[in-house]
Amino acid sequence: MVNQELLNPKTITIIGASNDTGKPGGNMLKNILAGGFSGIIYAVNPKEKKVQGITSFAEVKDIPQTDLAIIAIPAKYCPETIKNLAEEKNTKAFIIISAGFGEAGEQGKQWEQEIITSINSVNGCLIGPNCIGAITESYKGVFTAPVPQFNPKGCDLISGSGATAVFIMEAGMALGVSFANVFSVGNAAQTGVEDILEYMDENFNAEKDPLVKLLYLETISNPQKLLKHASSLIKKGAKIAAIKAGSTAEGSRAATSHTGAIASSDMTVRALFNKAGIVYCSSREELLSVASIFNYRKLEGKNIAIITHAGGSAVMLADELSKGGLKVPEISGLDAEKLKTFLYPGSSVANPIDFLATGTAEQLGIIIDYCEHKFDNIDAMAVVFGSPGLFDVENVYNVLSVKLEICNKPIFPVLPSVVNAQREIQSFLKKGHINFPDEVVLGKALSQVFKTPEPISEEISLPKIDVKKIRSVIDMVTEGYLDAEQTEKLLDAARIPRVTELVENSKEKLLTAIDSLKFPVVMKVVGPLHKSDAKGVVLNITSKEEVSETFDRLMQIDSATAVMVQPQLAGLELFVGVMKEPGFNHTILCGLGGIFIEVLNDVSAGLSPISKNEAQQMVQSLRGYKLIQGARGQKGVDENQFVEIIQRLSALVEAAPEITEMDINPLIGTQKNIVAVDARVRVG
């Protein structure tokens, strides 16, 4: 859908252009003129013969042919205007900044559809409606401010919200972040974030194109396209960070009223981002911090040296790095002692390296050199240096600027004195560097970048399962929850181990069969979906008499059809499950069972199909992972078996895409084996 008429037009016509730069059509023209567009510009305004020095036409029928039309007129006039442009003026690219379309109601949706039909009939491209426009190397087609200078090595920004794009650019420019192509897709009636990413991927040149891509999404209309092209770009050398808004019911409602978006589960989105290699961000501040990190050398290890003259900042940064899985290793030995001789008395080199409020530019340079060349246990440096009010810090920032250029290890500058050292910071930014004004924000962003996995590059191989048997079960069901027998057949076909059990609706038969099990046992009602809520689970049954009494009680529960008896197993409770969001592949979940999932929500997710590496990452990212390994004298579980079960569950839903929900909770795990104790499956 993206075409050269959009990216590099020879002629641009602004319909609704104005001499009043307080109006969108007026400021749009002003920005294009000021941006140095080298082609021909036409204006359409029935009341003016000249608009900002440009010849103005009264009607669209009067203009010459035009590559790109930018529309800034009321929504009700857009369908006919665009039809004329497409059919009579050979226009192939359209930007509609007007609002009042799909986000406003049924009439707006109808206008939107008429517009799409006209544009598609000429294989054209539409950005919008309800957007701020676009910036390319050719033109500055936005009606807002600020308008960043195009930097071919800056960040590409693709946003589902025009205002958010403005806020990101405004805040980014203050930090030293530069921008290249900017696309505000608005309602994305024809061209969405995924489509622009597709074009960037298919035409990517790692030597010439911007490497950093920033996304703000309110809807993911084509998850598979996003996954395919984001992961492809990252494999080619690009770096992508994204915000996905509308992940709660409240956020979804706000997104719906804004652009007609439908929110998807935050957990599913995170799983998609992880599979693609996209860094997940939850705010503009975090997005820009990640973008800033992308603009520095890649962090190859987790060991960070904190270099500062501010002890409190160092403590906060060390805490944040540690919480995020990075390390601030102790620095010691002969080289550390030698470094100390260059610093003032009272300085510390243990890490954080604190060279006091009186520390000099020369001392900073020496410290960085030692971290670069002498301290092999250091992978990167964070330099926190503000203005203590004792001296001009420009020399300090000059040294930092030089070291940023020549050091192989990444250096992340935190220059917090945005008032005291405003002039010096601006001088630093003009040299092409980026500032992190807050050390905690840097710590969070560094951790987020470091723990984001590389995109899945392997051909995913899933365990062998009995697909024929799975289909024989699924094909007999239309929708709803499977019964116990059907669920057991699916588990067996997927070769997911399950506990031995008896299911009977006759007490006499159950009492006869119970001899095959060892006490203690667990008895569960069959029929009600939520057994615990129905008080249909009884533990620690140690005799036939208790079996008889419990059977009678359980069969009195509403909708009870039978009673299930299982051995009462000892071990660590685990959980695996499946959920399916519209448009997405199945999301596979894993975690610890019991309180860990119910109260602490300690769950990790991956998008099916799940590779072995992905399954391992899912397990190891759990907050309760130490319990899986074994902690405080408690024996752990067989991690390899847990990983295999996650993969087998993925194989099951790949064979049975009709499954919409599934959970196995709990699995009971020991060092020797892991078995499913309870499961439920929903299709439809």
Tell me what each language-model feature is.
Residues 1-684:
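Catalytic-core regions of core metabolic enzymes
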